[in-house]
A protein has these predicted regions:
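An acidic intrinsically disordered interaction segment
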Residues: 2-23, 147-161, 236-247
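Metal-dependent nuclease catalytic regions and adjoining charged, substrate-binding loops involved
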Residues: 11, 79, 181-183, 193-324
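Short, charged/polar micro-motifs that form catalytic or ligand-binding hotspots
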Residues: 14, 35-43, 146, 178-186, ...
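Nuclease catalytic cores
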Residues: 16-61, 98, 128, 278-281
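Short, compositionally biased low-complexity segments
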Residues: 18-28, 48, 64-83, 205-208, ...
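Active-site-adjacent bridging/hinge elements
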Residues: 22-29, 162-169, 249, 255
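A non-catalytic, helix-rich entry segment at domain boundaries
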Residues: 52-137
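Non-catalytic protein-protein interaction segments used by genome-maintenance enzymes to assemble
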Residues: 122-194, 198-199
């Protein structure tokens, strides 16, 4: 039986970044939906920390809970989200992440923090704000459906008289003097202002709050990254061209019957080894007969960026009524 492929119905800035980084890895991860079955500690820890922040803020701002109760609820939610995952390093263990959450709200105290969630028209605060917009492309596998781009920010907030997207970044590395500069051209922080603009909510840019767990002490750093209208226009133009090119490559590959490397090129450089770990698909790039063994070596899970979760591919296909 041929391995199932599906072009994603929903994409986000991370997927586009990975397509730029290594088209072949993008093909394996998001078109063939290959997975080794192991979720990295970094992803699990980051997701759990974001969940803890969300629950804490909602308890305090939406439910009028006192800070101590709100933070306790956030810690409980973090532990539940982290689950029974066994961390490869103490830096991002469940216990360390709980400590980081508690220290975060000591560093940025509820009720005193000058970055405050914006209030929505329904009276609730914009905590975990999401958007989704249709792109002018028909899905190549499911005719009649559009491709959708989505984004999900930790918070939409008021700061210094303007609206900002807020995003927390956990890292196992120490902060450097150039740490803020990496965000000034990061596509994620163009995607959010662009998507919010489409929703009729203009924002100045993004506030990024780093949480470093490199040493014994947990440290915090905040920076702002502004986006102008011209930057959003360029980002939109290039984003559309990238999606169009990916769709063309995918369609041509399906029609050709050739090996995917004729259409989705490998990076053959730094992407093959990141943070002292090899790409999970490196062995496939080193094997002449890699396509023959995919089903025995990998599971198939589709990443759903709008839900921030993954699902077994066949289960997902059944849920949308797609049987091919």
């Amino acid at each position: 039986m041929a391995l199932k492929t599906l072009f994603p119905l929903v994409i986000d800035s991370t997927m586009l970044m990975e397509a730029d980084d290594c088209p072949m890895a993008f093909f394996r991860k998001y078109l063939q939906h290959l997975s080794s079955g192991y979720e990295s500690t970094d992803l699990i820890a980051g997701k759990a920390f974001a969940r803890g922040l969300e629950v804490t803020r909602k308890a305090y701002f939406n439910d009028d809970a006192d800070p101590e109760f709100a933070i306790a609820a956030g810690v409980e939610a973090l532990i539940e989200s982290y689950g029974d995952h066994e961390a490869f390093s103490e830096k991002k263990s469940a216990g360390k992440m709980c400590s980081a959450l508690e220290l975060y709200f000591m560093h940025y105290p509820l009720g005193i923090d000058d970055v405050v969630p914006a209030k929505l028209s329904n009276g609730e605060y914009a905590i975990e704000y999401s958007f989704a917009h249709e792109l002018p492309f028909e899905h190549p596998d499911i005719p009649g459906l559009p491709i959708i781009i989505t984004g999900r920010a930790d918070m939409l907030a008021e700061y210094a008289g303007r609206l900002w997207v807020v995003d927390e970044k956990t890292t196992g590395s120490a902060f450097t003097k150039d740490w803020p500069k990496q965000w000034d051209t990061r596509g994620q922080f163009s995607t959010y202002p662009w998507g919010l603009k489409k929703d009729g909510i203009p924002v100045a840019g993004a506030i990024i709050r780093g949480v470093s767990m490199a040493a014994k002490d947990i440290k915090f750093q905040q920076c702002e990254s502004i986006r102008g209208e011209w930057q959003l226009d360029i980002w939109e133009f290039q984003m559309l061209k990238k999606v169009e090119a990916l769709l063309q490559k995918y369609t041509e590959w399906k029609a050709s019957g050739k090996h995917p490397s004729y259409y989705f090129f490998g990076n053959w450089a730094s992407s093959c080894m990141k943070y002292f770990k090899p790409c999970q698909f490196q062995d496939l790039c080193r094997s002449r007969t890699s396509e023959q063994f995919l089903e025995s070596q990998y599971d198939q899970y589709i990443w759903l960026p709008h839900k921030q979760e993954r699902m077994e591919l066949n289960t997902y296909l059944d849920s949308i009524g797609y049987s091919k």
